[in-house]
Amino acid sequence: MALDKGTCLRYYKRKDIQEALVEHAGNKEIGIRYGDSFGKRPDILTYPKEVLELALKGATSFHCSEELWDNPLDLSGTSGKKELDGLRKGWDLVLDIDCKFIDYSKICADLIVKFLKKCELKDVSVKFSGNK
């Protein structure tokens, strides 16, 4: 089901959403989805106001790499492994709990978060993807 432009604009005009997206986008390549296709690569988000500007141009969602880059704009579709390894400065850890029972998934996610916090990780978040 496609999101209509009004729904996207109501969401992406929120300052808290704009700021959260830009904060999370730091040192990451951003993929901007326009309906059924993605925008140009590579791309980045730098300023909160860019989020609304892109939504006004038809952006329906924002996606980011798990990889952290020295400069995401240096990426190229023709870059080889050695070149990419030289540009990469780290990774986000993403754990995908793939279970058909949501209650089991919640228990598992809760235990993982508690463990990571016990290990003194500070930036831990959980996202439900809609069971897809």
Regions found by a protein language model. Give the residues of each.
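Short amphipathic alpha-helix segments
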Residues: 106-119
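Short, conserved phosphate-binding/catalytic loop or strand-edge motifs used
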Residues: 128-132
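DNA replication initiation on ssDNA origins
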Residues: 1-93, 99-102, 108
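A short linear hydrophobic-aromatic micro-motif
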Residues: 121-126
